């Protein structure tokens, strides 16, 4: 809120920041983009995403390097999402960050300084009011 709109309705610093980064201009009712710097080392990490994420459209996890850019790599893709990702038998999805050498599904190869952005399109009231959050990425056990 306060990012885009009439001169009277915006918060100047939010407006400047959002226009500088160039994306994220949709209102929160249409999309939310939590950016996460997990402070985890390069290794095998994962997020266990439940079968039902309270969004009206879809969700995605996008991987970035420490400069906020996609990192060139041998494996395809910089994103795992609810449309193209492989689901577990119970409908949940395991998103792997690191440990991709064995060809596992839904895996994003990580690098030093990695971070990620979760994109939630048409977030439900649970997300908007903060009673539901996307599962954290944790070291694999």
Residue ranges of model-derived segments:
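A compositional/structural signature for long, glycine/proline-rich flexible linkers
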Residues: 1-141
């Amino acid at each position: 809120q306060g990012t885009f709109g009439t001169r009277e309705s915006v918060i100047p610093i939010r407006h400047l920041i959002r226009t500088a980064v160039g994306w994220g201009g949709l209102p929160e009712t249409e999309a939310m983009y939590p950016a996460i710097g997990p402070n985890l080392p390069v290794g095998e990490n994962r997020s266990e995403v439940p079968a039902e994420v309270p969004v009206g459209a879809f969700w995605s996890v996008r991987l970035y390097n420490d400069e906020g850019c996609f990192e060139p790599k041998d494996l395809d893709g910089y994103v795992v999402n609810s449309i193209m990702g492989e689901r577990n038998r119970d409908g949940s999805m395991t998103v792997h960050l690191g440990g991709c050498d064995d060809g596992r599904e839904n895996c994003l190869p990580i690098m030093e300084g990695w971070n990620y952005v979760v994109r939630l399109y048409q977030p439900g009231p649970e997300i908007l009011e903060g009673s539901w959050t996307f599962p954290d990425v944790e070291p694999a056990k």
